């Protein structure tokens, strides 16, 4: 990609990504938009090309032009688990009226899959940081995030290379039980979210 003095740098195109990855443009599109329709190996080749070239999809070009606005991505199974939706609400409240755009990516239940959506996101230039809630982080995805230098925080999952925030379910359960026993209750019921 060449840059002339006084001119904006040319934008990387999907054609260049396809050439770099050695695939067709339709394969690039599938790998980025419906990753389940391509093999893991092909998807990884496309993502490597996206990262190497700094490709930003056209729909994100306008967002790239924003001035003074940060962009945080939140990847979470929020439609699968009400508790995750409440955490997402907490993130939105914390951002408040700060000049930060929050982009939410809904991930199917983490009980069904690890992070295929995260593995397929074209991250270059799109986000300033990422919050990953309740989704195990595959090593290939962790390596990609580290390679891009994209700051990421995990919620309710652990990975040695990333900061994380956790609820202490054991202590919480013990405190609830102690509270109920102190009030004379002896038979308990539990209502929770199904892990589907």
Task: Label each region the model flagged.
Residues 1-69:
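N-terminal helix-turn-helix DNA-binding module of bacterial transcription factors
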Residues 2-9, 67-178, 182:
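Alpha-helical recognition/docking segments in bacterial nutrient-uptake
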Residues 27-31, 74, 154-157, 188-192:
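Short beta-strands and strand-loop turn motifs
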Residues 57, 134, 195:
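Short beta->alpha connector loops of Rossmann-like oxidoreductase domains
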Residues 176-196:
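An alpha-beta-alpha
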